């Protein structure tokens, strides 16, 4: 079973189109069709339902998805290790990360990593905790940057401790206060970012059994920030997220203080590819300035 056929299968499963798969992998559509057809012959059953709208996994295809993903992962690991033994670093990585981390940390991390290992290509996927937990479980990513996932299924490397702060309109009576009482979140019109998605907001509210009066919900922190600036309510987030934003929103520490630890989750550090281990080391060094992190 050739890894290239499995890669074509994985791409088609993700994209739902043989044409898009061919464009992504640099083959002709007929070439992709032949590869997947040959793979189906080897396995003895169809992997896709085909229609004019594209392709969709059969039930057997869904069962084979994680197994063929492992075939591709093992192949890439073998390629990377053999290249490393020969003195050359190459390979490909898929990295999941918070939207805030992708905007603030990843440009510097990717610049440093590409300078050291130009032969390794990196693909980045942005998402929240729920999406990243799914990607880790599917092993469709090599690692994820964000808060620690629930449970102990993944290896976790803490890197950075950030403070959660209240976001208040600049005319709010506590905008210049030393602290914002945590329980007061229940007494203010609240703007909730991505509710019910296991976000840092969801976790803090659940941990302290707080039930704010939600007046608006948004999909991202930047929208929330601008709505707070307009005086439509209050919210909270990490200090990190608004570091490069310009605005009049007051960022006030909570009483009692609240923190979140950001780090790197890996399906298995022991089984991580050589390129993934190099990327993780480079990322930690870049974020911490050469320190070992928390």
Where are these regions (language model features)?
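Short helix-boundary/capping micro-motifs
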Residues: 11-28
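Hydrophobic hinge/microswitch elements
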Residues: 128-133, 137-140, 147, 196-250
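Secondary-structure junction motif
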Residues: 188-209, 272-281, 290
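Flexible hinge/capping segments at coil-to-helix
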Residues: 86, 153-164, 168-190
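Beta-alpha-beta core module
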Residues: 153-158, 162-163, 177, 223-271
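A short LG(V/I)-centered, amphipathic sequence patch enriched
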Residues: 40-57
């Amino acid at each position: 079973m050739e890894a290239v056929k499995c890669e074509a299968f994985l791409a088609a499963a993700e994209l739902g189109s043989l044409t898009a798969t061919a464009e992504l992998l640099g083959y002709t559509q007929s070439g992709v069709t032949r590869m997947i057809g040959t793979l189906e012959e080897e396995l003895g059953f169809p992997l896709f339902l085909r229609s004019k709208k594209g392709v969709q996994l059969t039930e057997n295809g869904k069962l084979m998805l994680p197994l063929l993903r492992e075939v591709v992962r093992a192949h890439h690991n073998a390629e990377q290790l053999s290249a490393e033994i020969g003195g050359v670093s190459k390979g490909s990585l898929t990295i999941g990360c918070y939207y805030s981390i992708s905007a603030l940390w990843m440009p510097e991390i990717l610049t440093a990593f590409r300078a050291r290992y130009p032969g390794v290509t990196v693909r980045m996927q942005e998402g929240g905790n729920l999406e990243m937990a799914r990607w880790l479980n599917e092993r469709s990513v090599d690692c994820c940057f964000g808060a620690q996932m629930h449970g102990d299924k993944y290896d976790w490397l803490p890197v950075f401790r950030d403070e959660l702060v209240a976001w208040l309109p600049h005319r709010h009576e506590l905008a210049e206060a030393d602290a914002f009482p945590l329980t007061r979140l229940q007494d203010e019109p609240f703007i909730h970012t991505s509710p019910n998605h296991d976000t840092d907001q969801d976790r803090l509210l659940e941990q302290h059994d707080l039930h704010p009066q939600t007046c608006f919900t948004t999909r991202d922190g930047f929208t929330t920030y601008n709505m707070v600036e307009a005086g439509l309510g209050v919210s909270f987030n990490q200090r990190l997220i608004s570091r490069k934003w310009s605005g009049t929103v007051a960022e006030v520490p909570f009483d009692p203080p609240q923190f979140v630890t950001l780090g790197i989750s890996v399906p298995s550090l022991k089984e991580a590819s050589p390129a993934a281990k190099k990327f993780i080391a480079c990322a930690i060094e870049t974020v911490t300035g050469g320190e070992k992190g928390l």
